[in-house]
Amino acid sequence: MNGYSNPSVDAERLRMRTCSRQLRPAGAYYAARFSIGKDEEILCLRRLFSRGGNPLFLEKLVLPKHSAERKRVPLPERGSLWKLPLPGVHSTRQSLELVELERRDLRILRLREERAALCLEREYLDSEGRVIALQRVLIPEGGEEELIVER
C-alpha cells in the first residue's frame, strides 16, 4: 500500500467540530511511541467530521508538547489534519487496521452500541526515525464514508 486518502475530507458540505484539546502526561503507551518520559506532556486533539448532522469520522492528533511548541504546529481551523504540514518531518509510516471503538469515541460519534472502526494511522518521523506526531482517523463500521487505497 502506497497510501490512502479520504475524498470527503475536502468536501464543502463537511462540517468539523473540535471535540477536545488537552495537555496531559504521556503515560507508558505514548512515552514509548514518542521516546519521551511518562510524565512529559503531550497535546491531544480530537475533531469530529459530519455531514448533514450525521457524524462520519473522528480524527485525532497526538504530539509531544515540546515538539508542538518548538515547531509552532499550525492546527487548521477547517480541513483535515491529514494534510497538516509538520516541520521536521523526514518521512511517514502509514497503517490501516480494524479496531474496536473506545467508549469515549462511541459517545463522540453518537453510537449506542459497541462497534468496530477502520483506523487509518500515520506516524510522522524525524530524520533519526523518531515518531514526532501521530494522526488517526476512525471510520465507524457501517458508515457512509468512502476510502481510497493506493497500491
Segments from the language model and where they lie:
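HTH-adjacent hinge/linker in prokaryotic transcriptional regulators
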Residues: 1-41, 66-90, 145-151
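A short glycine-rich, His/Asp/Glu-containing loop-to-beta-strand
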Residues: 14-17, 44-46, 51, 55-61, ...
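Solvent-exposed residues in well-ordered beta-strands and their adjoining turns
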Residues: 24, 50, 62-64, 99, ...
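A short beta-strand signature
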Residues: 39-52, 118-125
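Short, structured loop/turn "capping" segments at alpha-beta junctions
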Residues: 55-56, 89-91
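A short, surface-exposed beta-strand/turn
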Residues: 58-67, 135-144, 150
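Extended hydrophobic
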Residues: 92, 97-127, 131-138
